Amino acid sequence: MIVLDTHVLVWADADDHKLGRKARILIDRLWPLGQVTVSAISFWEIGMLQARRRLRLPVSVAEWRDALLSAGVVELPLDGAMAVRALDLAGLHDDPADRFIAATALLHGAALVTADDRLLDWGGALKRYDARE
């Protein structure tokens, strides 16, 4: 199972060239198996980016989310265990969405697919794939 970082979800949906060949193959292989997941916090993060005009979706965040879930992306909900785990990620930067996404991957035993160098370089015990490869 893999957890897509927010920007990777956007790239995968848009078939963006920023998504590397290896990452695309991994996503395409796991998608039909129901093993491509996303933290629920990613939809909040997308909404915040859209509100700040840093991202434009052709539809509302709710419609975009529904379309992705209908297409087979699995949403992993937030819960108290994740909130506590997100607090306990020594050395990880303070971005709350990144902390929740990392905690989600850790608690589900999943690998994180990201292009965020801060997450890729973090020393924690999280399996990661560089989405640019």
Where in this protein do the model-derived segments appear?
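Short, well-structured N-terminal submotif of metal-dependent ribonuclease cores
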Residues: 1-38, 52-66, 70, 108, ...
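ABC-type ATPase nucleotide-binding domain
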Residues: 49
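Active-site neighborhoods of divalent-metal-dependent phosphate/nucleic-acid chemistry enzymes
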Residues: 56-58, 62, 69-117, 129
